[in-house]
Amino acid sequence: MAQIFNFSSGPAMLPAEVLKQAQQELRDWNGLGTSVMEVSHRGKEFIQVAEEAEKDFRDLLNVPSNYKVLFCHGGGRGQFAAVPLNILGDKTTADYVDAGYWAASAIKEAKKYCTPNVFDAKVTVDGLRAVKPMSEWQLSDNAAYMHYCPNETIDGIAIDETPDFGKDVVVAADFSSTILSRPIDVSRYGVIYAGAQKNIGPAGLTIVIVREDLLGKANIACPSILDYSILNDNDSMFNTPPTFAWYLSGLVFKWLKANGGVAAMDKINQQKAELLYGVIDNSDFYRNDVAKANRSRMNVPFQLADSALDKLFLEESFAAGLHALKGHRVVGGMRASIYNAMPLEGVKALTDFMVEFERRHG
């Protein structure tokens, strides 16, 4: 079978080694003669899976001991509600920084539970889309927390700065599309959450990192399944968790550790992004409209100079084993999502195709 490279924004490509191991263990896991999908989440065998996954995740991100790690349901959209329901306390407002589609979606959900103070960080610089630096973000004095999204998958915009707003500002961040792709200082955040389906594992699992002093503040109307304290008190097993996604994510964590950890991913992700953006920037046939300082290393949107060629580009790239390159309906064009599991070889195959396509149709 020819090599297929999946550039989907999520659910996304998984490491081949992880899929091979899961395939081998699918019907007989740990010598039990059953699948990991069939064993009790409260049995000692799965408890070991859960504990190892949390330990490996903590090791990868150097999570401080005063932070809890929760394995949840609900995805990023679930956390759009969970954050205000858990962190507002007796306050009625929170700061939200709008830099793209997903930040705006979080704001829309937050309006059900509080009065968000919205700061529009989007700007245009020399005709390119960009984000105002954190030093210009206008925060309010009475906010319970400040929320932002470091990587906008649809817009292809990244905010790589580390928050430094003082110890009194609780920073909540949606790391769904950039978690584990580069080192982060967890201690600068109050809450970090991430849907699994991009850099962690299969869809269905959400990981939350929450500073322990923020527990116990949930709104009385907060559903129990979204209550961080209840999830923590029950070791993320208040109800039956997504066990297969948890298991497979644990395999991804071990794969990451075996391949140099987050620091190694950071380097190769930079190489992949530089290769792809390099082809775009050195061409009049392709274009990207994001300022270099805010370009995403995970999600690279680009347009063809002649949009009439879009359909042909997608057809020929798919035939060449380069799948899921169609851009989001909001922005159109193309988008290559190059998360941790995408090897440099895959990006090289894409750029070779792009150069050849331009030669034939430019």
Curated annotation (Swiss-Prot):
Keywords: Amino-acid biosynthesis, Aminotransferase, Cytoplasm, Pyridoxal phosphate, Pyridoxine biosynthesis, Serine biosynthesis, Transferase. Its EC number is 2.6.1.52. It catalyses: O-phospho-L-serine + 2-oxoglutarate = 3-phosphooxypyruvate + L-glutamate; 4-(phosphooxy)-L-threonine + 2-oxoglutarate = (R)-3-hydroxy-2-oxo-4-phosphooxybutanoate + L-glutamate. It holds the Pfam family Aminotran_5. Its cofactor is pyridoxal 5'-phosphate. It is an enzyme of class 2 (transferase). Signal peptide: none annotated. Pathway: Amino-acid biosynthesis; L-serine biosynthesis; L-serine from 3-phospho-D-glycerate: step 2/3; Cofactor biosynthesis; pyridoxine 5'-phosphate biosynthesis; pyridoxine 5'-phosphate from D-erythrose 4-phosphate: step 3/5. L-glutamate binds at residues 9, 42. Binds 1 pyridoxal phosphate per subunit. GO terms for cellular component: cytoplasm. GO terms for biological process: L-serine biosynthetic process; pyridoxine biosynthetic process. One of its GO terms (molecular function) is pyridoxal phosphate binding. The modification N6-(pyridoxal phosphate)lysine is found at residue 198. It is found in: Cytoplasm. Pyridoxal 5'-phosphate binds at residues 76-77, 102, 153, 174, 197, 239-240. Catalyzes the reversible conversion of 3-phosphohydroxypyruvate to phosphoserine and of 3-hydroxy-2-oxo-4-phosphonooxybutanoate to phosphohydroxythreonine. Homodimer. Belongs to the class-V pyridoxal-phosphate-dependent aminotransferase family. SerC subfamily. This is Phosphoserine aminotransferase. It comes from Escherichia coli O6:H1 (strain CFT073 / ATCC 700928 / UPEC).
